């Protein structure tokens, strides 16, 4: 596979309201060890040594306050109320990118080494790369009434993390073809019939979504794990 040397731009959609988290503020701005989740997520990208530029996408009313939180070389732009619109807004200011990472601000403790591994796969010629972990629980499919309709084979299931990495050309094409709202960028790429490569993720790259997640994240920070 040909080795790519072009710029890597990381997009960080940060418009989530954090309703399930139980905090009275956007999720990305919740305190985590004396700083925000967003700041920690951006720091991880920068510390990886694999990212050339970071673009953070927030609601329009938070653009200026977000800029004051982050290093001056981080680009902050206004995005949509949903993830899809935010990623599109980020892509619009990433014209220089050969590769694009899309990273959840709520995965604030993602190790820089995982980010670097995703980029390494892209530079080795992969067009779409996602970190994953095996699923510990048995998963059921259910209908609208809650009746169980099936039990997928657990050995074939994986929980997907971020950053998800793509060639910029492929991700732009996937978003151009997208209709409606998507929660997973790789899913849009799959719709094009493209192959998505998975690599082993990291337990600490979990998404901070519930109050219990936040307790765990704060405990890890307090213990010096991050």
Swiss-Prot record:
Q: In which pathway does it act?
A: Isoprenoid biosynthesis; isopentenyl diphosphate biosynthesis via DXP pathway; isopentenyl diphosphate from 1-deoxy-D-xylulose 5-phosphate: step 2/6
Could you tell me the keywords of this UniProt record? Answer: Isoprene biosynthesis, Nucleotidyltransferase, Transferase
**Annotated Gene Ontology MF terms?**
2-C-methyl-D-erythritol 4-phosphate cytidylyltransferase activity
Q: Give the EC number(s) under which this enzyme is classified.
A: 2.7.7.60
Catalysed reaction(s) here are: 2-C-methyl-D-erythritol 4-phosphate + CTP + H(+) = 4-CDP-2-C-methyl-D-erythritol + diphosphate
| Site note Transition state stabilizer, residues | 20, 27
Q: Which residues of this protein are annotated with the site description Positions MEP for the nucleophilic attack?
A: 154, 207
Database matches in InterPro entries: IspD, IspD/TarI, IspD/TarI_cytidylyltransf_bact, ISPD_synthase_CS, Nucleotide-diphossugar_trans
Biological process terms from the Gene Ontology for this record are:
isopentenyl diphosphate biosynthetic process, methylerythritol 4-phosphate pathway
Q: Which Pfam families match?
A: IspD
Main function: Catalyzes the formation of 4-diphosphocytidyl-2-C-methyl-D-erythritol from CTP and 2-C-methyl-D-erythritol 4-phosphate (MEP).
Q: Which family, according to the similarity comment?
A: Belongs to the IspD/TarI cytidylyltransferase family. IspD subfamily.
Which NCBIfam families has this protein been placed in? ispD (TIGR00453)
Q: What is this protein called?
A: 2-C-methyl-D-erythritol 4-phosphate cytidylyltransferase
Which organism is this protein's natural source? Rhodococcus opacus (strain B4)
* Protein's gene: ispD
């Amino acid at each position: 596979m040909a080795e790519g040397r072009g710029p890597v731009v990381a997009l960080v959609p940060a418009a989530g309201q954090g309703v399930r988290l139980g905090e009275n503020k956007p999720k990305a701005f919740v305190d985590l060890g004396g700083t925000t989740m967003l700041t920690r997520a951006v720091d991880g990208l920068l510390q990886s040594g694999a990212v050339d530029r970071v673009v953070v996408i927030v609601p329009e009313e938070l653009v200026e306050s977000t800029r004051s939180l982050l290093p001056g070389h981080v680009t902050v732009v206004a995005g949509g109320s949903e993830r899809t619109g935010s990623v599109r807004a980020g892509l619009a200011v990433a014209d220089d990118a050969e590769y694009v990472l899309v990273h959840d601000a709520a995965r604030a403790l993602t190790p820089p080494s995982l980010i670097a591994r995703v980029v390494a796969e892209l530079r080795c010629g992969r067009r779409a790369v996602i970190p994953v972990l095996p699923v510990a629980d048995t998963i059921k499919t259910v209908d609208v009434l809650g009746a169980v309709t099936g039990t997928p084979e657990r050995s074939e299931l994986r929980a997907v993390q971020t950053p998800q990495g793509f060639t910029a050309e492929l991700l732009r094409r996937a978003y151009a073809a997208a209709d409606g709202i998507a929660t997973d960028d790789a899913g849009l790429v799959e719709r094009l019939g493209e192959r998505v490569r998975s690599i082993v993720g990291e337990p600490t790259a979990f998404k901070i979504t519930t109050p219990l997640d936040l307790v765990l994240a704060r405990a890890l920070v307090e213990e010096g794990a991050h």
